[in-house]
């Protein structure tokens, strides 16, 4: 019996030690210094999407460039599908804020699960194109984001781009708000989207994105919304016959770094991280825009029926959502509203 108890105690200690190691392994772990006295780092980064997405490709480019330019002094391991937070994207950004991991690519929608002000840029029908969205982020909007992220312990390394969010469903093409009535859509855990879909007569529900394919396959939900890259890389064409291109919400990507980690770096490493992050963002945006038309064609070839809303149809949705803009200005605050919400909405 004493021997058995000792083994159990040892196993318990080992389990606790492993948990501690895993918890600390994302915190900008350093591994001594080089011969010339520079600090070595082993960092971790997550993306919400899978390994065929432009998010992942850009993150891998960032990792490869860091390792190459530092001769292996800095390495970065990229994890797909929010693996470090068991698929929970909001928990993932909280890890970044708390320093349990080092970098992430996340949508502002996910940050809005922590602070709803971050969702302002994704408000419905405020941008006509991805170029309009990027222009807003290059100006006052980007600085407001940087300030608010800093308050939450995240250093902004710029923006990538997931694109305009589109709609898929099982039952019919969507042309008017009435076409949404009674349909159950999976949405991110984001109050704005919940109110938006209810206002349009749909039945919104939230769940981790990793569960969406199975829920669609089993008929537990009727549809979902996401950018084309995410729809394609998640193989939703296998379980969704209808795709509506309505460009209702612009979805940039926040490339964030734990701020304490960034502040702990020397100026040379800070400059290096900033420069290579900018390169990764530019690469991701280019790949995303270049690939979208081709991906839509491939979705059609796979059997999806695709319809695109006219300007008049978009105006009908915009008119139906006017109460949302009025209500959410109080949530977004003056800084975010001024930076992103057009006058008259």
Regions found by a protein language model. Give the residues of each.
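N-terminal secretory/targeting leader peptides
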Residues: 28-127, 151, 156-345
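A gly/proline- and charged-residue-enriched helix-loop-helix capping module
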Residues: 128-148
